[in-house]
UniProtKB/Swiss-Prot annotation:
The lineage of its organism: Eukaryota, Fungi, Dikarya, Basidiomycota, Ustilaginomycotina. Gene3D superfamilies: alpha/beta hydrolase. The active site is at S167, D224. Belongs to the AB hydrolase superfamily. Lipase family. Class 3 subfamily. GO terms for biological process: lipid catabolic process. SUPFAM superfamilies: alpha/beta-Hydrolases. This is Secreted mono- and diacylglycerol lipase LIP4. Secreted lipase involved in Dandruff and seborrheic dermatitis (D/SD) probably via lipase-mediated breakdown of sebaceous lipids and release of irritating free fatty acids. Shows activity against monoglyceride and diglyceride substrates. Due to an absence of fatty acid synthase genes in Malassezia species, secretory lipases are essential for the yeast to generate free fatty acids from degradation of sebum and assimilate them as lipid sources for growth. Plays an essential role at the pathogen-host interface during disease progression. It comes from Malassezia restricta.
Length: 300
């Protein structure tokens, strides 16, 4: 846990070097509703989101209804990524969250808002800005991930493509979803982001809503502080699609429509520990401690 404490200590430094921009998007006041998606699907996505944390075991491993097909990286120089074929979600790519690697941690604190790299710019509308470190982490894996996805789509005769991830991996998952939605003929099927930090500006949030809204969901567990960074006052904004598990690691979950819903996770002060960031999501352990290796689905 020492590297996680170190990461937490770096957040004030990141805040000091970013120019305040003001709140850059709406605050929804819509009432919460029941989930618009079967929680069993969310449980499956959570299991696949955890699997990149598992170093040992790999190709052929089963995670719920999915089989690991391909993996790359050890979480040191680049984030680990794994691709599955899931009966319920199709060809699924999952990105690892922050590791003890200095390079991984630096992705989290490189918090400047930048224009999308030229390779992915066609996926976005004018005015979109991305969290630099998260964008860089995705770009390091982008081309090879795309090649593998296309290969496995053909191999399994399955057009469905899903992205998932936890923490830093969640940010990479939404960036991948936007990119793949543009590059793939049939777009993406679903995208799930567990414990996702804010990944772009208001234009980014609007673009996500416009292009993959209804297929993208981000999940907050209790008073997890990670989805609250970086602050909205610095120009960062979550898209729509929040599912809030509260109390944490329980079966009490609701969907909070619109961006930055007033009644959702923003309504409670975050706790400055990782107890809620790593937790039980839809009966599946995810993150350091609650998650096990190999990953499992629906066993927590």
């Amino acid at each position: 846990m020492r590297f996680l404490a170190f990461l937490l200590c770096l957040v004030p430094l990141a805040l000091c070097i970013i120019e305040p921009r003001g709140i850059d998007g709406p605050t929804s006041h819509e009432a919460p509703t029941d989930l618009p998606i079967d929680w069993h699907i969310l449980s499956q996505a959570a299991g696949m989101a955890h699997e990149p944390y598992c170093l040992f075991g790999d190709i052929g491993d089963r995670v719920g209804d999915a089989e690991v097909l391909w993996s790359k990286g050890h979480g040191v120089v680049i984030q680990r990524v794994k691709i599955f074929h899931s009966k319920s979600l199709g060809v699924t790519v999952s990105f690892e969250g922050t590791t003890a690697s200095l390079l991984s941690i630096l992705h989290d604190v490189n918090a400047a808002l930048i224009d999308p790299p030229k390779e992915v710019a066609p996926a976005y509308c004018e005015g979109v800005k991305l969290f630099a470190g998260f964008s860089n982490a995705y770009m390091e894996l982008r081309d090879e991930v795309y090649e593998q996805i296309v290969k496995f789509q053909k191999q399994f005769n399955d057009k469905r493509v899903t992205t998932t991830g936890h923490s830093l991996g969640a940010a990479m998952a939404v960036l991948a979803a936007m990119d793949l939605n543009k590059r793939l003929d049939d777009g993406i099927y679903r995208s799930f982001a567990f414990g996702m930090p804010r990944t772009g500006n208001g234009a980014f949030a609007n673009d996500v809503d416009k292009k993959i809204g209804g297929r993208f969901f981000y999940i907050v567990n209790g008073r997890d502080w990670v989805p609250r960074v970086l602050p909205r006052e610095l120009g960062f904004q979550h898209p729509s699609g929040q599912i809030w598990i509260n109390p944490p690691s329980t079966t009490h979950w609701k969907y909070y429509p619109g961006q930055e819903n007033h009644y959702g996770a923003n309504s409670e002060d975050p706790i400055l520990t990782f107890d809620d960031h790593h937790g039980i999501y839809f009966h599946t352990g995810l993150g350091h401690g609650p998650g096990k290796c190999p990953a499992s689905v629906g066993t927590a």
